[in-house]
């Protein structure tokens, strides 16, 4: 459980309750902490420790944490002859029109660029080490249990769910029926990670549903599941250049990973409702 080296870490011990493996806590920016792993041998390394908040604009911190530390982990995987699955991001696409396709990237913030740089570094290592499995997964809009500790960066699903449980109308940007995202449930994301272990070839792959749904859809489905009819409160979108439409091209994910999403937005939210209710008003933070 390696933190990302700054105060934007979203890890929490409660997400580890019930885990029976060895737990070593460290900072991926610290080479001495990485050395703590030397006594272990790994078949696969899942690298999900990094800055994941797109609103962090300190370029030096982001590049050191996301890219420099990734280089250390690639060297570690090479030494251990371990296959590596790591988290890339749909932020590498910026505001390119849908469907977003691997090989067509235009990052528009330091976070997106750091993930793009990681993908380039992974490709270089793949060419130089053809027997080493290295797969990057570009996650789109993930939602589901165990994200609560991300606070304000948690998914729209849990944030709107708690607004509704507070007895309030969900608050959305004006025109939210036309703001589209590729929302994918965490269970599908976990499956994608597992299937990446047996990828036909190294590379970077999109992890989304291939279908875009609106912010308004989220609010409407939640109200249906929670048996409420509060309507929706709209406010002006304060962000200029706001991304209006993300939708993953998952053709290569199907071909090379065998990954196809199984859970629709309606099914995912329905499954998530008990957790949303349990956490409502909780001091679990």
Annotate the PLM regions:
Residues 7-13, 96-99, 147-151, 218-220, ...:
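Short aromatic-enriched loop/helix-cap "lid" or pocket-rim segments at secondary-structure transitions
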Residues 165-285:
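C-terminal substrate-binding subdomain of Rossmann-fold SDR/epimerase-dehydratase oxidoreductases
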Residues 68-72, 116, 120, 158, ...:
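Short, contiguous clusters of charged residues that form electrostatic/catalytic patches at enzyme active sites
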Residues 1-140:
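N-terminal Rossmann-like NAD(P)+-binding domain of SDR-like oxidoreductases, especially those catalyzing
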Residues 92-94, 142, 179-180, 214:
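Short, active-site-adjacent cap segments at secondary-structure transitions
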